[in-house]
């Protein structure tokens, strides 16, 4: 189980995996092929992990590596996707997808659209999407493990957000994470939009 040392609400996901009789190794730092072989890892579940998983690791696991992501991919890839879903007024939601070499570009396994009201805050919206991710995993974990869900390739559109963009906008919020959804949406009203240009993604190469 790959995550970061500041991530909250990870116990529910760990408990879910252990409920199916699997041993869970919790890891925060980077991994390589030697680590995977030494620990005899056969599946990776990534949740808010901050390191790149290299191609040789993905190939060694035969694609058995998935990630949770708090947006309706292909929109809001990258940093703080929930925040940018609100700011840029795109659909909100959560996705579970295969891990590939790209940034949140892997095939989509399952998704769920979410809805916030204007008086929700960034903090309460975080609580909502975390519960949704856990629920989505609970409903589909057995089917994911047994490959009973056919992953769907992502459309080659969408956008990527970066920490430097988030820092610019978040600095304008006097209430920080207690800022309401309505206030976040209003940041761009009557102000020039600092555009987050869609990144063009090349066609996926076959690794046969």
Positions of predicted regions on the chain:
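One-carbon transfer enzymes
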Residues: 1-208
């Amino acid at each position: 189980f790959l995550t970061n040392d500041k991530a909250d609400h990870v116990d529910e996901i760990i408990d879910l995996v252990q409920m199916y009789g699997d041993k869970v190794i919790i890891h925060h730092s980077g991994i390589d092929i030697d680590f995977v072989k030494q620990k005899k890892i056969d599946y990776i579940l990534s949740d808010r992990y901050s390191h790149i998983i290299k191609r040789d690791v993905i190939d060694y696991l035969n694609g058995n590596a998935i990630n949770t992501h708090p947006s309706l991919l292909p929109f809001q890839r990258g940093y703080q996707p929930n925040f940018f879903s609100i700011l840029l007024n795109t659909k909100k939601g959560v996705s579970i997808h295969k891990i590939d070499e790209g940034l949140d570009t892997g095939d989509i396994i399952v998704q769920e659209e979410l809805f916030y009201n204007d008086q929700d805050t960034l903090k309460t919206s975080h609580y909502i999407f975390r519960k949704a991710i856990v629920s989505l995993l609970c409903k589909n974990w057995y089917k994911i493990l047994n490959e009973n869900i056919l992953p769907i390739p992502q459309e080659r559109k969408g956008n990527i957000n970066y920490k430097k963009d988030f820092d610019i906008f978040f600095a304008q919020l006097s209430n920080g994470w207690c800022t309401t959804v309505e206030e976040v949406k209003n940041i761009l009203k009557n102000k020039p939009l600092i555009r987050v240009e869609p990144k063009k993604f090349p066609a996926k190469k076959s690794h046969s």
